[in-house]
């Protein structure tokens, strides 16, 4: 197959295929550079292209799901232009069609989460706490804490979601905590990669990923591009 959709890529298809296979084997850019003979900078550029396609794939599933409007997330077309750098790294976790899904939350703080956990009806109904109906848990990627929202009445089958989200959180922490001083502009890409790897852990990831990068629409997700642009612009300001 042709790998021309890896925009900006200048390597022959054979090398693109090799990088993709080694990416699926979960090797680092340094390891792949040593094996393939391609510079680490170039490998990292391809990593970003691959992760962007994965993020678009995950977001396409979220947007197609017509999630409840009460989900106060930055993933909808209306919210992606918000400035995520000025907000803590909080993500909502929920189960959708048997898969773990994640969404960056733009209007929340630790105090709000604790009030939600404590079922502070007065604060919630009074509007001082944002409503996150539909989420099973909220993850704080600053302090690496997971807050369960088992008091949320808008979520079905909480007990069924418990093992999946617990497994996903362990998987994600083990992958991301090894990064030191991760650029916040790449955090969403890494979280979406974790989401993808966890949800397809029982599948042939190379086959799934090959299908993703051969689909033009996953390289033209305007909502995701706006989201990434907001990260970049805010960091440069």
Which residues does each predicted region cover?
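Residue-level recognition of single "structural anchor" positions
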Residues: 1-237
């Amino acid at each position: 197959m042709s790998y021309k959709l890896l925009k900006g890529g200048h390597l022959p298809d054979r090398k693109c295929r090799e990088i993709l296979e080694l990416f699926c084997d979960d090797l680092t850019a340094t390891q792949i550079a040593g094996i393939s003979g391609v510079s680490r900078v170039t490998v990292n550029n391809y990593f970003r292209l691959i992760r962007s396609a994965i993020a678009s794939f995950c977001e396409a599933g979220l947007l197609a799901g017509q999630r409840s409007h009460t989900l106060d997330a930055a993933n909808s077309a209306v919210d992606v232009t918000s400035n995520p750098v000025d907000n803590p790294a909080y993500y909502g976790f929920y189960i959708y069609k048997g898969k773990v899904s994640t969404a960056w939350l733009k209007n929340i703080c630790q105090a709000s989460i604790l009030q939600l956990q404590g079922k502070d009806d007065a604060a919630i109904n009074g509007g001082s706490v944002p409503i996150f109906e539909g989420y099973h848990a909220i993850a704080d990627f600053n302090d690496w804490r997971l807050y369960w929202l088992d008091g949320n009445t808008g979520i079905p089958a909480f007990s069924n979601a418990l093992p999946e989200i617990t497994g996903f959180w362990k998987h994600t922490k083990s992958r991301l905590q090894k990064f030191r001083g991760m650029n916040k502009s790449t955090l969403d890409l890494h979280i979406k990669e974790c989401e993808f790897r966890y949800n397809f852990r029982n599948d042939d990831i190379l086959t799934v990923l090959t299908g993703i990068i051969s689909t033009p629409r996953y390289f033209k997700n305007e909502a995701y591009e706006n989201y990434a642009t907001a990260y970049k612009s805010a960091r440069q300001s």
